[in-house]
Amino acid sequence: MITLAIPSKGRLKEQALEVLAKAGLAISLPGDERKYHARVEGLDNVEIAFLSASEIAGEIGQGAVDLGITGEDLVRENLADWEARAEIAARLGFGHADVVVAVPEIWLDVDTMADLDDVAADFRQRHGRRLRIATKYWRLTQQFFSQKHGIQVYRIVESLGATEGAPAAGLADVIVDITTTGSTLRANHLKVLGDGVVLKSQACLVASKKARTAGDEATLRDIVTKMAAAVG
């Protein structure tokens, strides 16, 4: 049995169902929307599970589901050593959003990550503390700042509410957040650094690297092939 997890609500659910239908995988939806399982018409060995996008990433990592439709940002953020546990089988062409580094607009001389590195080094001397970064993306932020750009002098602060409001509230100096149009960032007088795109994310079909029978593996690969063809 192959379990395919798709988002349980909203536009992501609608778009996931559209891609599945285009791939010839019509879903028999339950009459009761509170039910979280469905079947693929004509495929008795495939079960559909409706979960939140963040839950799907976790379930893929644990091997609790075989396939899932979720954001690439959630896979990379929520799964340690994700490439050993999952593979992105297809990018589906919807749910586009960028994880970005944004700073206050009034920082006129800060336009790149190199500029921000200078600010971070100077911050401790001027203010007696490290540069604070508000984000829900701890793993991606650490990889981008420390590993890719060599920035070490900073502190990540937990973002419990609307991340983009943290600098104005005095809770952080910089943010790393996900955005689709950038309008919310601009409304909060923030700007994205020129080389500050951490990840260009979209909805993906993700496969767990769990062990499975030859028959289940063949079914999984058939689903992947059909969905990849459907999105071109």
From Swiss-Prot:
Gene Ontology BP, a term: L-histidine biosynthetic process
Molecular functions (GO terms): ATP binding; ATP phosphoribosyltransferase activity
InterPro entries, per database record: ATP_PRibTrfase_cat (IPR013820), ATP_PRibTrfase_CS (IPR018198), ATP_PRibTrfase_HisG (IPR001348), ATP_PRibTrfase_HisG_short (IPR024893)
Record-linked Pfam families: HisG
Reaction catalyzed: 1-(5-phospho-beta-D-ribosyl)-ATP + diphosphate = 5-phospho-alpha-D-ribose 1-diphosphate + ATP
EC number per UniProt: 2.4.2.17
Compartments it resides in: Cytoplasm
Cystine connections: none
One Gene Ontology term, aspect cellular component: cytoplasm
Keywords (A to Z) from UniProt: Amino-acid biosynthesis, ATP-binding, Cytoplasm, Glycosyltransferase, Histidine biosynthesis, Nucleotide-binding, Transferase
Enzyme class: transferase
Spans through the membrane: none
Pathway, per record: Amino-acid biosynthesis; L-histidine biosynthesis; L-histidine from 5-phospho-alpha-D-ribose 1-diphosphate: step 1/9
Notes on the domains: Lacks the C-terminal regulatory region which is replaced by HisZ.
Function, as annotated: Catalyzes the condensation of ATP and 5-phosphoribose 1-diphosphate to form N'-(5'-phosphoribosyl)-ATP (PR-ATP). Has a crucial role in the pathway because the rate of histidine biosynthesis seems to be controlled primarily by regulation of HisG enzymatic activity.
Quaternary structure note: Heteromultimer composed of HisG and HisZ subunits.
Family: Belongs to the ATP phosphoribosyltransferase family. Short subfamily.
Protein name per Swiss-Prot or TrEMBL: ATP phosphoribosyltransferase
Gene name tied to this protein: hisG
